[in-house]
Each structure stands twice: as C-alpha cells, then as structure tokens.
Amino acid sequence: MNTDELLRQYDNGERDFILANLSDACLTERCLAAINLSQSHLANANLSGSNLQRANLSAAVLTRAMLWRSNLASASLMSTNLNEANLIRATLTGINGNGASLRKADLRLADLRGANLSQVNLVGADLRYADLTGVNLTGANLSRANFTGANLAGADLRGVMLTHTIFENTDLSDISLVEVDLSQVDLRSAILS
C-alpha cells in the first residue's frame, strides 16, 4: 500500500491498516486520528506534525521515524519499536507505551504527562526538558538516558534500571524510588523533595 492509497481510504472512513508497509512514507502534517497501524512497518517514515491521537501503533516498527511535533495523545504504543525515532516536541500525553522500545530516541521537550511507560526501554534516550509528570515508568530501563531539566514530579520509578542515567536539574519531587539503585546516577542540582 502506498501513501496515496492509505490517505484515500482514510478519507473515505477506513481506519484499519494493520500490517501496512509504509517504510520511508511521507505523511507530514496529516490528520490520522484513531488510525490502526498496529504491526505496521513505518521505519524511516516522516509523520512530523501529524495528528495521531488515539492511534493504535501497537507492535509497529517506527525505527528512525520522524515524529517531530506530532500529536500522539492517548495512542497505543504497546511493544512498539521507536528506536532512534525523532519525537522532539511530540505530544504523548496519556499514551500506553507498555513494553515499547525507544533506544536512543530523541524526546527533547516532549509532553509525556500521565503516560504509561512501564517496562519500556529508554536506553540512551534523550529526554532533556521533557514533561514526564505522573508518568508510570515501573520496571523501565533508563540506563544512559538523559533527563536534564526534565519534570518527573509524581512519576513512578519503582524497579527501574538507572545505570549512568543523568538527572541533572531534574524535578524528581514526589516520586517513588522503591527498589531503585541510585549509585551510578547523576543527580546534580536535582529537585528531590
């Protein structure tokens, strides 16, 4: 399926595009709210500025995808591969990203308030100045992730892996750190109360 066919079918009311192959597709600034692209291949796709609210991207492959300024509020990203994806300034409020992989993803200035990111892989991810207020990160791997200037107030960090994680100037107030080893974490100027 090519992008023209997908857009035509979407405009005609179709929402299910399970297992679609849209690698390298250009779908910038499009309204694709409530689309079902679960298990689809979207590696290197450009979805910058698109409206993907309530989209189902579960188990989809979005490796190196461009999602800059995209709106993914309340989307399902369970077990989605977003390794090395560009999510700068993306809206990810209320997403279900349980088990997703975001290795080396760029999430600078992203809005992740209230997201479920339990069991997520954020190894080497860049989350500088992101808003993660009230995020569920239980059991997540945050090794080598950079949270400089981010807001994690009220986040649940029970059982996370934090090897060489950077929390410089990060708001960590009212968070749960049960079963967390902080011995190899940079907490310079972090807000802990």
Language model features by range: what are they?
Residues 2-193:
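Tandem repeat scaffolds
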